């Protein structure tokens, strides 16, 4: 038996700063899972912001792998860090008078989310691309390519839409659903 645990659960975030945009969601974003400094995996999907944390298919599907204290990092723009940094440098040279908020519209993020991320750096939305310092550019890259959320906890059984664990599938014949350990014992449903 694999110990049962909640699955398809929302994630509660420590020191959550996005409660003001509860109800806002982003589509098809990449989420990275870190435990300490080690990247354990990544998952792509839609993400919803709640009053206390993260939800939506991109989080729910990944929740079985997440533990308290883990860090989720969300890539809001789908560019790799080096690509985004290069794009910002090029834009500052060619479109230097453009405000950072205007430039970032091409990534089609909800305005409220965009403003919260800029505020977290902090950088004023009206700051022109040519005025952005190297330090601010690095902060922009970190914030938009791997925005960090420290997991306080994963929703428990009362919030989970499914359960992970139970009978080990390694001990079940997948064609007949008969136990490999106890002949004549068959499983049905969520095992």
Where are these regions (language model features)?
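A short, aromatic/hydrophobic, helix- or strand-capping loop or linear motif
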Residues: 5-7, 155-156
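A glycine-rich dinucleotide-binding beta-alpha-beta segment and adjacent secondary-structure elements
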Residues: 116-191
